[in-house]
Curated annotation (Swiss-Prot):
Keyword set, alphabetical order: Cytoplasm, Magnesium, Metal-binding, Pantothenate biosynthesis, Transferase
Pathway as given in its UniProt record: Cofactor biosynthesis; (R)-pantothenate biosynthesis; (R)-pantoate from 3-methyl-2-oxobutanoate: step 1/2
Binding residues annotated for 3-methyl-2-oxobutanoate, in chain numbering: D42, S43, D81, K110
SUPFAM superfamilies, A to Z: Phosphoenolpyruvate/pyruvate domain (SSF51621)
Enzyme Commission number(s) from the entry: 2.1.2.11
Protein name: 3-methyl-2-oxobutanoate hydroxymethyltransferase
Pfam families the UniProt entry points to: Pantoate_transf
Subunit comment: Homodecamer; pentamer of dimers.
Length: 261
């Protein structure tokens, strides 16, 4: 049975599993594996669409992939990212969230930022939209943070992240993602918040963990961040299978009699 926002609000201290999925087959596999929540992240821009960052991802693209993921995982709680600038104002955020929830079938939306987006979060929650916050490394604005690197090393950075997480909770977010922050900071934030935290590159002390599907299964062999654990080398196995197929076609081995009518 699909979890509800209330379940996640009461999930503090539980070891929850989030996983990204961007289409019907990956969402179907994630649901079959029993994950607690699927995140249709704007990371799809990089791992599915080949963009250099998440910035070019549009609302229409997010909607397209959210619909597909929902069809693949009808019984799993599904969170969809609000893409870059889709929540620059509350009106824009409400329109984007409306489409992702009503048309896309998402159960909640995620947006990046701390204190600076707290009022947007408050307005969304007031309108009945469940919101997952996101602090630390925020990929949509990574260039302002010096690139894709660890955040919160310096005391002032750590304070900003903690204050941001607390502001998101106070605004009504049902949980907060902590990305690429020191484990000790993630532990402190997790202990200070009453809502659950979701870590990615944030150590073992968060309430939940999230990883990108393609990283977990090793679809891209040349990309492995330090915080990723690969459970399969799918990219290599798939490439080997496709090479064998091509070879057998060229050699006249496939199709054989057993593949013919």
């Amino acid at each position: 049975m699909r979890r509800t926002v209330k379940d996640f609000r009461n999930a503090k201290g539980q070891r929850l599993v989030y996983l990204t999925a961007y289409d019907y087959p990956t969402a179907r596999l994630a649901e079959a594996a029993g994950v607690d929540a699927i995140l249709v992240g704007d990371s799809l821009g990089m791992v599915v669409l080949g963009y250099p960052s998440t910035v070019p991802v549009t609302l229409e693209e997010m909607l397209h992939h959210t619909k597909a993921a929902r069809r693949g995982a009808p019984e799993t709680f599904l969170v969809a990212d609000l893409p870059y600038l889709a929540y620059a104002t509350l009106d824009r955020a409400l329109l984007a969230a409306e489409r992702l929830l009503k048309e896309g079938g998402a159960d909640a939306v995620k947006l990046e930022g701390g204190e600076e987006v707290a009022e947007i979060v408050r307005g969304l929650v007031r309108a009945g939209v469940p919101v997952l916050g996101h602090v630390g490394l925020t990929p949509q604005t990574a260039s302002q943070l010096g690139g894709y690197k660890l955040q919160g090393r310096r005391p002032e950075e750590a304070e900003r992240i903690l204050k941001g997480a607390l502001a998101l909770e106070e605004a009504g977010a049902y949980g907060v993602v902590l990305e690429m922050v020191p484990a000790r900071l993630a532990k402190e934030v997790t202990e200070r918040l009453s809502v659950h935290t979701v870590g990615i590159g944030a150590g073992p002390h968060t309430d939940a963990q999230v990883l990108v599907f393609h990283d977990v299964v090793g679809l891209y062999g040349d990309f492995k961040p330090r915080f990723v654990k690969r459970y399969l080398e799918a990219g290599r196995l798939i490439q080997e299978a496709l090479s064998r197929y091509a070879q057998e076609v060229r050699e006249g081995v496939f199709p054989g009699e057993e593949h013919s009518f």
